[in-house]
């Protein structure tokens, strides 16, 4: 039998860590594409961001739930902050978290910690540290036999 409770229990959520943007064309496109993908799959969006960021910037997409982390932006979150966010997600976002992501590079580490606590797939903190250390990342790729171009050259365009 169909009931409101069964609909709530089946609701899926995407946690988006870092819902504010610099306003660049690229980031606006990423957020819009993420929003459209969630809408297409009937996934609700729970935005998570720092209070100070939210004072100065407006999320470029609609979110169904917005969780504020107290204070200024910081690169990492401690265990108590993570536990508090997880509890708030469980309280305010009935159903299940299907995914957790960060579209902006400077929110990847916070997302990794939160996704681990929620129990969804993620890049580990070590992986993120390696990716964000560009010279070390390029060196690891080279050692694995994967060579990247040093710069992008477009045929017919002079620099």
Regions found by a protein language model. Give the residues of each.
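Active-site helix-to-loop segments that bind/position phosphate- or nucleotide-bearing substrates
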Residues: 148
């Amino acid at each position: 039998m169909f009931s409101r409770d069964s609909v709530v229990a089946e609701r899926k959520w995407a946690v988006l860590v870092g819902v504010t943007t610099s306003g660049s064309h690229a980031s606006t496109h990423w957020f819009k594409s993420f929003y459209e993908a969630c809408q297409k799959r009937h996934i609700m969006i729970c935005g998570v961001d720092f209070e100070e960021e939210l004072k100065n910037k407006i999320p470029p997409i609609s979110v169904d739930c917005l969780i504020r982390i107290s204070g200024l932006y910081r690169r990492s979150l401690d265990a108590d902050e993570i536990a508090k966010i997880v509890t708030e997600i469980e309280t305010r976002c009935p159903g299940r978290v299907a995914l957790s992501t960060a579209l902006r590079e400077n929110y990847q580490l916070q997302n990794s910690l939160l996704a681990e606590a929620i129990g969804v797939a993620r890049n580990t903190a070590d992986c993120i540290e390696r990716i964000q250390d560009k010279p070390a990342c390029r060196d690891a790729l080279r050692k694995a036999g994967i060579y990247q171009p040093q710069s992008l050259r477009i045929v017919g365009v002079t620099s």
